[in-house]
Each structure stands twice: as structure tokens, then as C-alpha cells.
Amino acid sequence: MRVRLSDKNIKELYPNIGNLLRTTRLGNLKSLLQDDYTGDNDCTVTAIACVLKISYDKVLPVATKYGYTSKKGTNPLKVRNIMQETIPNGYVAKSAYGKGIGCTLKKLETILKTTPIVLNLWNDGRSYYKNHSVVIIGVDVYEHGVFLRVYDGWHLETSLIDYKKLSIIMNINWVEEV
């Protein structure tokens, strides 16, 4: 199913989803598009710039120092290091690995009360995203489904990821005040 999931088609693609039970959303973040920058495979660099609300040009040299190339992209295990070097004093970068292990739904909802999250995913379970980084800005919990609300770097509007179908191979990165 290689179709972008959004508010416009969620009821069509998930007709038995039921009612929205609760939502957690950040409203003070601007979406960034990868096409607005010069690199290829720069989804992680774009996502970090979006989350930290800093210039792409400030993130790129640090990402390059940690192995980013336009041919291979960014090693997901280095995202926390890149974020730590680019955030202002008084903050610390954090990471969690594996859906249901370090990255539970409860943890996502707790973090999203204060800050957006960089999600490095291997596969979204719907064959739309593969080996891609997005910015999580919300969680929508329905009677029969849970969806991550994301900026994917390809669209200005939010897209949705079916949390239940998300691959266990993934990690999240965010910042907290010290």
C-alpha cells in the first residue's frame, strides 16, 4: 500500500477505525521540506533542523562529522550525537530504541507534551516510508488504531503513520532541559 496516509484519507483507508479517543499534538513547529536544501538522503538533517528550530546549515557540518553523506544518509545511531552538538546550552539529547521496548506509546505521548521527536524508521509497515527520518508532532488514539502525526520532509502538511504497523527496528531522539 504505497499511499501517503493523511487526515484526508484515513477514514477511507481505515474504515473501521472508530472514534478518536485522545490526541497529543504540538502546534508550534514549522514543517521543513528536504527539497528546499541541497543534499540528497538528508531526511535526518532536515528533521533535526526542524525539531531544534535551527538552520539546516548549522546541522549539516555536524552531521557530516558524524558520517552523513549524500550517498548514504545518516547513521541513525549517531542522531543523538548530532543533536547534542547542535542544541543550545541547558539541554540534553536523549534516545530510545525499538518499538515497544524503549519507544512505547506512553513514552511518545509523554515526550510530545513538551517537544517534538525525530523518528528514524526502517519500515512503516505500509511500504510508504522505508529507511527514512520524520518528525513526530502528535499521536492520535482511536478506538481501533493509533497513528503518529508527522512532518515527513516531503509535504508541508502532516502525514500519519500507523503505529501498530511500524517496524520494531526504529529509534527516537529528542531534547530535554537539564
Residue ranges of predicted features:
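Active-site-adjacent structural segments surrounding the nucleophilic cysteine of cysteine proteases
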Residues: 1-72, 142
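Conserved active-site-adjacent core of cysteine acyl-enzyme catalytic domains
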Residues: 54-56, 61-178
